[in-house]
Design a protein with these regions (language model features):
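Extended, charge-rich alpha-helical interface modules
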Residues: 1-95
Length: 95
């Protein structure tokens, strides 16, 4: 699923469909942020490693925000996803 496929769900009159769309949108954004944070952490740690076989070092991904703030955002988004998952279980919503 990608963000475009959730547009119709967000416009539904059924709150369960909007709920699913919100969950999937948040999950997509969370996974993208997680990937960025993983790349940032790997680049930070690679500074202490010798160059790879090709003789190059890992480049730091472009980001304008401090890495610790991005990690905090990921953590809070993860908590929010967990809340949505618990609520879905309670309300019988299949994500």
């Amino acid at each position: 699923m990608d963000l475009k496929t959730t547009i119709e769900m967000m416009q539904s009159d059924d709150y369960k469909e909007r709920f699913k769309a919100e969950y999937h949108q948040t999950k997509i954004r969370y996974e993208r942020l997680k990937k960025l944070n993983t790349q940032i952490e790997a680049a930070e740690r690679a500074i202490f490693c010798p160059p790879n076989r090709a003789g190059t070092t890992m480049a730091m991904p472009n980001h304008d925000c401090p890495a610790d703030l991005l990690r905090q955002q990921q953590s809070i988004m993860g908590e929010y996803l967990h809340i949505l998952e618990v609520r879905a279980e309670i309300e019988g919503i299949v994500l």
